[in-house]
UniProtKB/Swiss-Prot annotation:
Binding-site residues for Mg(2+) 2, renumbered to this chain: N240, S244, E248
Protein known as: Monoterpene synthase 25
Annotated Mg(2+) 1 binding sites: D115, E180
Motif (DDXXXXD motif): 115-121
Entry superkingdom: Eukaryota
Cofactor(s) it depends on: Mg(2+)
Role played: Terpene cyclase that catalyzes the cyclization of geranyl diphosphate (GPP) to myrcene and linalool.
């Protein structure tokens, strides 16, 4: 699609900047580390989430390793196992049921793995939805067959509404991954912010990770937390975008939410990051107001703190370079 006044077309220059409709987008100001330090400090100041200590769970690690071994390609999946374990022992450490934590971990391994084009292309992902409807894929061995069994188990661990939502979120993620792997998404219309938000929501499986916060054993009544789900979803997306920024800049990645939002809104990268911080802080306050005091609020607060630690305690995001500290798990 050729660029006109109605389209935003992005391509890389030799200097690593981006061209938007014939104009150079505003580059990141100053060094990446300095910017990230400032952004992360501002994020912590505005969101006001505590920083509790989290520990490894050897039993969970052993159980997950045994299951992943049956999927094949264990070595290639190892980095995704590390990230998924860290997510569970931090953001979902408040969940008492061991089997629920196992399923969250396995779900996450497959979601992250399918985000890898090498893994995605090795699976029959493009026919996933149709084969799910016909019941064929449920009997297959390997990762996609395992994924269907994980999804089937969600009704054992979450209320009907939440389990339905988790299932639908997973299907939306696979659909979005197909689009990202088959379509040139570097060309955006100049007023495409709603599409950028829509795509980000699908690829982040935000509905699933929001619903994971409130398991059925403690929260059988969805009405207790349902109105908080949209802002919890926003938190899932934006915290990841803010705290993944350093990793993505190191890798030279520009096909991501921060850059795409900056392009379609005409803002600089630092301004875009600060807007996300403000929107995240507002979302946290709304969740707190909606949930009030009690167990549902406590579950969210644990998730909010743990989800930050997912990024600061994980070598995947390289944030030790920026803010110091130690990683929870370097490898398994």
């Amino acid at each position: 699609m050729s660029p006109t006044s109605d389209f935003v077309n992005t391509t890389s220059t030799a200097k690593g900047h981006e061209i938007i409709a014939g104009l150079t987008a505003k580059p990141v100001e100053g060094s990446t580390i300095t910017l990230c330090k400032d952004i992360i400090r501002e994020f912590f100041d505005k969101v006001q989430v505590p920083s509790p200590n989290f520990t490894r769970d050897p039993e969970l690690e052993a159980r997950v390793a045994d299951i992943v071994r049956t999927w094949g390609n264990e070595e290639h999946l190892r980095p995704y196992v590390v990230t998924s374990l860290i997510l569970t022992v931090t953001a979902y450490s408040h969940i008492a049921n061991f089997e629920t934590r196992v399923q969250i971990t396995l779900f996450t391994i497959i979601i992250i793995a399918m985000d890898d084009p090498v893994v995605f292309d090795s699976l029959a992902t493009r026919e996933f939805h149709q084969r799910m409807c016909t019941g064929v894929i449920q009997d297959e061995a390997g990762m996609l067959g395992a994924f269907t069994k994980i999804l089937e188990s969600m009704w054992d661990h979450y209320s009907g509404f939440s389990a339905n939502t988790i299932y639908a979120s997973a299907l939306r993620f696979v659909n979005a991954s197909i689009i990202e792997n088959e379509t040139d998404v570097t060309t955006l219309r100049s007023h495409a912010l709603p599409f950028v938000e829509y795509k980000r929501s699908m690829t982040a499986t935000t509905e699933a990770y929001a619903c994971f916060i409130w398991d059925k054993a403690r929260f059988p009544d969805v009405k207790v937390y349902m109105q908080a789900i949209p802002d919890a979803m926003l938190y899932v997306s934006y915290v990841n975008d803010i705290l993944s920024f350093y990793k993505e800049e190191l890798a030279g990645e520009t096909a991501n939410y921060i850059h795409e939002r900056a392009y379609v809104t005409g803002k600089s990268i630092p301004d875009t990051l600060r807007n996300l911080i403000n929107e995240t802080a507002s979302a946290v306050e709304r969740v707190r107001d909606i949930l009030g005091e009690g167990e549902a609020r406590a579950a969210f607060e644990n998730f909010a703190a743990g989800y930050i630690r997912v990024h600061t305690g994980n070598p995947r995001y390289h944030l030790k370079d920026v803010i110091g500290g130690d990683y929870i798990i370097d490898r398994v």
